[in-house]
Amino acid sequence: MAKIGFIGMGNIAYAIMRSLLNKYKTEDITFTDLNRRRVAQIEKETGVKAVDTNQDCAENAKYIVLAIKPQFYDNVLADIKDHVTKENIIISIAPGITIDSVNEKLGGDRRIVRAMPNTPALIGEGMTGVCYDKKLFEETEKQMISNFFESFGMMEIVPEYMMNAVVCISSSAPAYIYMFIEALADAGVKYGMPRDVAYRMAAQGVVGSAKMVLETGKHPGALKDDVCSPGGTTIYAVSVLEEYGLRNAVIKACDACYEKCIDLK
C-alpha cells in the first residue's frame, strides 16, 4: 500500500510530489488524474505509478491529498466517500473549502487536514498554512503531517479562520512577486541591461531581501530604512512607490483574493 495518494496532479500537486520524492520511495506514492497524457508524462519523469480511479487511490493510500479545484470537490468526495475510513487522513489543498464541508460530504467522523501550499514547493522553498484538529491524530501521525509539509519548505499551523488569509499572502503571493520581478527587470532593460541579467539581478534582490526579513528578525520597515540614505537615490524611489500607492494596491489585491475565497465556499 502507498503511504500517500494524490487525487489530481496539477502544478501544486506535482511540485509537492517532486519534493516528496527526496524523502520517499516511488512505491510510497501514487496518484490519479483525468489527463491521460499528463499521467504518462509524470510516470515517465518520476517513476511514480498512477492508479486508474479515485476509488483505487483512496483504497491504496493512508494519506489522501485532494489536489483538485474547488468546483470538482463535490463529485470527487462523492466518488471516494465509501472508500475512506477513520484510518485515512485526508489532506485538502483547495482554497475556500472548509474542514467541516469536506467531513460532511465524506459522511462525517473523518480526519481532515486543511492546507494551502504554494508553487515554490517545486524547489523545496514552499510555504504552507496548515490546520487540523490535533485531538484526532496520534503523535506519530502529527509528526508525519509535519514531515510531509516540511519536505517541500516551511509550514505554519494556523487556526482555520486564517486560511483565506494564507491564500492571499502566501499561496497566491508568488504571482504578485513575479510581477514585481518582471517590472524591475523591464526597468533594467529600459536602461540598456540585457534581459537575462536584469531577471537575475531583480530575482536575487527579492531572494536576499526575503532572507533578511526571515533571518534578522527586523521589521521590514526598519530594513527598508536601512537602505534609504538621507537625500539618496533609494528614498526618492520609495517616495514614488508611496505616491502611486504600492501598499494600497497590494492590500486591495489581497482583498479581492480573500473575497474570491469566500465565494468558493
Tell where the protein language model's regions lie, with residue ranges.
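Internal alpha-helical scaffold of NAD(P)-dependent oxidoreductase catalytic cores
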Residues: 101, 105-111, 127-166, 178-215, ...
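Small-residue helix-packing motif on alpha-helices
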Residues: 29, 39, 57, 194-201, ...
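Rossmann-like NAD(P)(H) cofactor-binding subdomain of soluble oxidoreductases
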Residues: 37, 46, 54-59, 63-130
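NAD(P)+-binding Rossmann beta1-loop-alpha1 motif at the extreme N-terminus of oxidoreductases
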Residues: 1-52, 56-59, 125-126, 189-191
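Short pre-catalytic strand/loop immediately N-terminal to key active-site residues, enriched for Gly-Thr
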Residues: 113, 163-168, 220-225
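NAD(P)-dependent Rossmann-like dehydrogenase/reductase catalytic/cofactor-binding core
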Residues: 203-265
